[in-house]
């Protein structure tokens, strides 16, 4: 039996991932036999399990009748020495049997399945309920192993008799739940008499899909569900859940965000009272994938968003009005958004543009105009056309342009401005952060695993020379997202009749909008730095060097790297100063900060920064990415053998094949919009850039510091998230050859050559400034700065 797992009450949706080994012997041992009879109380056919009677006559009887006659023990076993003469006998021709493990796995694989996780009492028996708080998803790895994800809606009820949501007792031993241990209760979990008809309706749809005619056995979906529950129980891998009270105090966690034009990264760190900060406890923000629930993405992620609601099963909302398993954000971001768009076929089939995604909301902080068309949820099924964005509990807070409404009259249309889209990104990030900090993994890692975590501060960095209006908009969106998520839980919990305090309304966004709004005459009243993207690396560098390399002794650091401050007014104590220049090359801007640091000799070390020069330049990683796509992927001259397969690869591959009018074809596919390029052509060009060109360019950039060339095929490049078939077919029809046939050479020298051509002038200007201010240390940050060619410049 797997150890029990712990979830904190009222900590939103919590996920637990584990592997389960399938035992072939369990299939035979857990077969389920049953009869179907019309039930007048339920007014439909219902089933009753049949079990074998002792003896050699191959006779069976209904378990329900045996229970009524007292022939079933308290443990659910048949009392074999009973007199069965009065029992109605059933032979093998009168009942049905299910027990095909592969078949039931095919029906349930990659679907969210409601699971009866019921409360245990002190004598290890189970009560019936709660009925709607745990669901299971699995994917088969091989014939003997499946990957499993459990998700629990941890919202609790204030009513101890509630059968839908869990109630948290003061006695911790009363808050242990496990998968239902007997078939009778499992059957009750699908029974309309227990208000669980929604489960049976959902399981029925998974089995019968679009079948219009049915024949006996009518209830094989229920029988297979019971068989599946038997398998889960017999494997012993489904853990018990211990639901911990959220009323024993909480621990603050801070979130630091660097929202980029193309990539975003975030870190979480605890501030447990009485403990000094430890960089080793910092965790990257992980994004739980909802489309592929077994995937969790801990790396930096794309800022692209797509409107798509997170669902945990297509349940009939008329039958299930519990309002459980609600995720507050209507957007997906990062890897999941990329995959959704790569797999999209609906736009082509609809032959119209579906306004469901945006490449980078941060680019449009100035655009507060309503969209000309309504935003729609992305659909991956042509039979389910896109619908306008409406998220219960969120849409009621918004004006039509996506801003927070100040009264109860909310907007009737989803024509959100591009500026407001960043608020939706924050909404998703904060929901993911709250999920992660209350996960069992995070709590166990940081200690005090029984205490709830809350977001306390959200620190958001920005480009060094970002204009004040955009700085305010960047942080204002975060403040609005916090407000929205607090209000959301107030609206949803009122419907659920639950008690919950998920998000702390005193969350601080740093720097605050109030701070940023101070004019030049009141800057001394500011509480916080603006945490620009060039200064942040300096702070981390100073902390790391002094604390770890110099054992916490700033004297050693300043004596080694610094110089005498001859401008000091204190002639007796001329402290040494260190001037640091930092260059951060991001996606949209390259930021420069030159700052002089001094410190005093008091008992408490105080290092004082004095900014000398700062600027942002609109030349950065996106410009390099564009040049790599243009020069390596699309068109370019092969002037020597070294350029082959890494210069104008598409153009030169076409010429080698003898394709006519190559330049015209390139212009027709990649050129500017014209009347000759229809909707499909424009869509395919966008899809090519997003699905093919950018991923390949990033692979080239990732190889920039490696030694030697690397030859890759199409399948090598796209081991995950391959381009859509429609896009590849369109490419072939346009150019006359398959894109998959192209061979690619990842050439570090070619990438570094392009990098030098893009940044040489800028680096020369920055180097002049660094020399002018006589910097003692120069810090390079950002992915591009790791390229050898840039260091050489």
Predicted regions located by residue number:
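Early-domain small/polar-rich strand-loop-helix modules and first-structured segments
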Residues: 1-396, 622, 627, 632-636
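Low-complexity, highly charged intrinsically disordered N-terminal segments
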Residues: 121-122, 127-216, 372-423, 430-520, ...
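Phosphate/oxyanion-binding active-site loops and adjacent basic polyanion-contact surfaces
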Residues: 218-228, 353-357, 411-437, 467-474, ...
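Phosphate/ATP-binding catalytic cores across multiple sugar-kinase/actin-like superfamilies
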Residues: 228-250, 421-450, 538-571, 723-774, ...
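Glycine-rich phosphate-binding loop of actin/hexokinase-like ATP-binding domains
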Residues: 257-295, 532-536, 541-637
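Phosphate-binding glycine-rich/basic clefts of nucleotide- and phosphate-handling proteins
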Residues: 278-373, 594-734
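Glycine-rich phosphate-binding loops at beta-strand->alpha-helix junctions
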Residues: 455-473, 585, 775-792
């Amino acid at each position: 039996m797997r150890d029990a797992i712990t979830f904190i009450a009222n900590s939103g949706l919590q996920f637990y991932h584990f592997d389960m080994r399938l035992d072939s012997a369990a299939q035979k041992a857990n077969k389920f036999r049953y009869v179907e009879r019309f039930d007048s109380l339920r007014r439909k056919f219902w089933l009753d399990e049949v079990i074998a009677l002792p003896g050699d006559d191959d006779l069976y009887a209904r378990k329900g009748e045996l229970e009524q006659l007292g022939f079933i023990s308290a443990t659910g076993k048949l009392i074999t020495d009973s007199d069965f003469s009065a029992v109605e006998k059933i032979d093998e021709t009168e009942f049905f049997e299910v027990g095909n493990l592969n078949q039931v796995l095919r029906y349930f694989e990659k679907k969210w399945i409601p699971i009866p996780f019921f409360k245990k009492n002190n004598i290890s028996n189970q009560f019936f309920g709660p009925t709607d708080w745990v669901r299971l998803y699995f994917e088969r790895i091989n014939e003997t192993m499946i990957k499993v994800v459990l998700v629990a809606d941890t919202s609790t009820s204030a009513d101890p008799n509630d059968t839908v949501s869990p109630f948290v007792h003061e006695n911790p031993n009363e808050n242990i739940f496990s998968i239902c241990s007997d078939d009778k209760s499992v059957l009750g979990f699908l029974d309309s008499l227990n208000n669980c008809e929604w489960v049976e309706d959902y399981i029925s749809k998974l089995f019968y899909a679009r079948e219009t005619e049915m024949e006996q056995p009518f209830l094989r979906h229920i029988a297979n569900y019971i068989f599946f529950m038997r398998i889960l129980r017999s494997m012993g891998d489904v853990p018990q859940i211990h639901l911990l009270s959220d009323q024993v105090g909480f621990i603050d966690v801070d979130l630091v965000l660097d929202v980029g034009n193309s990539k975003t990264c975030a870190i979480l760190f605890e501030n447990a009272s009485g403990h000094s900060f430890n960089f080793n406890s910092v965790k990257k923000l992980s994004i739980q994938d909802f489309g592929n629930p077994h995937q969790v993405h801990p790396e930096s992620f794309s800022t692209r968003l797509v409107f798509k609601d997170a669902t945990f099963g297509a349940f009939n909302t008329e039958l299930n009005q519990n309002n459980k398993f609600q995720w507050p954000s209507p957007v997906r971001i990062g890897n999941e958004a990329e995959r959704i768009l790569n797999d999209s076929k609906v736009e082509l089939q609809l032959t119209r543009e579906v306004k469901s995604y945006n490449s980078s909301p941060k680019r449009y902080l100035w655009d507060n105009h309503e969209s000309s068309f309504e935003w729609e949820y992305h659909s991956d099924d042509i039979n389910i056309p896109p619908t306008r964005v409406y998220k219960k509990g969120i849409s009621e807070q918004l004006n039509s342009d996506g801003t927070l409404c100040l009264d109860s009259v909310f907007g009737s249309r989803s024509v959100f401005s591009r500026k407001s889209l960043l608020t939706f990104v924050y909404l998703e990030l904060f929901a993911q952060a709250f999920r992660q900090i209350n996960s069992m993994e995070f709590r166990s890692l940081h200690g005090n695993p029984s205490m709830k975590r809350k977001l306390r501060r959200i620190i958001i960095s920005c480009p060094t020379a970002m204009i004040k209006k955009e700085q305010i908009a960047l942080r204002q969106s975060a403040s609005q997202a916090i407000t929205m998520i607090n209000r959301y839980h107030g609206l949803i919990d009122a419907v659920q009749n639950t008690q919950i305090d998920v998000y702390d309304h005193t969350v601080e966004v740093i720097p605050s909008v109030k701070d940023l709004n101070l004019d030049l005459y009141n800057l001394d009243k500011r509480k916080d730095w603006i945490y620009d993207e060039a200064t942040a690396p300096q702070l981390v560098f100073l902390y790391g060097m002094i604390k770890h390399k110099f054992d916490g002794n700033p004297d050693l650091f300043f004596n080694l790297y610094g110089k005498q401050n001859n401008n000091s007014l204190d002639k007796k104590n001329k402290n040494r100063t260190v001037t640091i220049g930092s260059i951060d090359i991001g996606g949209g801007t390259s930021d420069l900060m030159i700052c002089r640091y001094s410190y005093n000799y008091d008992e408490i070390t105080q290092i004082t920064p004095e900014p000398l020069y700062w600027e942002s330049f609109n030349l950065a990683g996106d410009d390099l990415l564009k040049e790599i796509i243009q020069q390596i992927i699309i068109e370019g001259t092969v002037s020597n053998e070294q350029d082959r397969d890494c210069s104008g690869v598409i153009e030169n591959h076409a010429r080698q094949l003898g394709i006519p009018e190559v330049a015209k074809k390139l212009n027709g596919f990649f050129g500017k919009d014209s009347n000759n390029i229809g909707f499909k052509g424009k869509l395919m060009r966008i899809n090519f850039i997003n699905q093919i060109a950018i991923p390949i360019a990033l692979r080239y950039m990732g190889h920039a510091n490696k030694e030697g060339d690397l030859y890759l095929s199409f399948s090598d490049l796209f081991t995950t998230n391959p381009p859509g078939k429609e896009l590849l077919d369109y490419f072939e029809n346009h150019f006359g050859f398959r894109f998959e046939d192209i061979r690619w050479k990842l050439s570090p020298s070619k990438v570094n050559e392009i990098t030098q051509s893009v940044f040489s002038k800028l680096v020369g200007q920055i180097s002049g400034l660094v020399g002018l201010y006589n910097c003692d240390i120069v810090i390079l940050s950002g992915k591009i700065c790791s390229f050898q060619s840039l260091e050489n410049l």
